[in-house]
Curated annotation (Swiss-Prot):
InterPro entries: Lnp, Lunapark_Znf. It comes from Arabidopsis thaliana. The lineage of its organism: Eukaryota, Viridiplantae, Streptophyta, Embryophyta, Tracheophyta. One of its GO terms (biological process) is endoplasmic reticulum cisternal network assembly. To C.elegans C05E11.1. PANTHER family: ENDOPLASMIC RETICULUM JUNCTION FORMATION PROTEIN LUNAPARK. Residues 218-265, 367-408 are annotated as: Disordered. This is Uncharacterized protein At2g24330. One of its GO terms (molecular function) is ubiquitin protein ligase activity.
Amino acid sequence: MAVGEKEHEGTVVESGGEKNDSAVVLSASGEKKTTKRKGLFSRLWNAIFRVRGDDFEKRLKNISKEEATVRNRMKRRSITRRNFIRNLIAFSVFFEVIAVSYAIMTTRDEDLDWKLRSFRILPMFLLPAVAFLLYSSLVGFWRMCDRRDQHTLEKLQAEMLGKINELKERTNYYITQQLIQRYDPDPAAKAAAATVLASKLGAESGLKVFVGDESQLEPTAGKNNAKHSGGLRNRKQTNTRGNSAETTPIHHSDNESNHSGTSERITGTEQNQQMVFEHYNPQEYAAHDGSWISRIAALLVGEDPSQSYALICGNCRMHNGLARKEDFPYITYYCPHCRALNKPKHSEEHSLIAPADTLPKVSLKPMESEVINSSSSTSERGNSPIPLLHTPEIVEEVPETAENETPN
């Protein structure tokens, strides 16, 4: 026992002899916890270069609490005001009915003095005045309190914004965001940093800066431009239809509309490149379907149906109107039913005859009202399910000699 006590005392002496800067703190459960004290150098460094994050955090927390208190007070005042106004109106109407009834019941006697009569009638006029004065005074007081709280709220918000800006300046927040945007491999972090920098730029310049994916904006802009250019072309073609007595089945769009919608048409061509077909059996194209009514109608407008070819889609075999015999080898169009691109069989030979530099190649995006058929084509379309507005889009590749020979 003595040896054990000596060993225990020895360990205690050794532990007490060691110098340790840690302070012993007893917790609520009775366990000892040691907290290491900071050295002199670390204290000086923190006193000179520290950001005082604890002070900022405490002040921002106090500001948020005060702001929440002010907002709750304004909300309670608004609820109290609504309840008071509702109750005041209800009680005013109730007591006014009682006052009117009392005045009618007590002034039936004709022998009453005018002073007594006026005294009995007075509550009927006095109650509305009292209610109005009470309403105006209390509402004015509440509005004054609301203005004061709103001013306090604005001051708190301005103070919080100033504290946050000061903290950002001390911690080089925007410089950090710029470095993240430049060198961080994570695209999400880059996008967040770009949003922060754009918001700062907008706040400094007073402009609204939108930061987003450009790929999401380009399709919408293309659709709007396509709708606008399509509307211009449709109006122009309707005017041409009303002025001309003899219409041709193919109308060339002018160069301005072609150049203005080049990007949209290229997009439409890329979307339909996977569905490209040749004209369906052009040698057996009988433009007329054998009905004498359609022949008579075509002859009345001055067009011989035997000199026209029917445009049959190579994919869905649908009838898409008529084309002249001399224009048929050069026609390329989109089928409005299946959106397939139909080209002539000998397009390669024609491309050898007329080089690509001299040909006015235009790839049009599928749009309505690109081809205006004559009345013969409308009569031919009697057995066809295609309505008048869903005519095929025509793309011509005509040499200069062919343009001089064929009428527009």
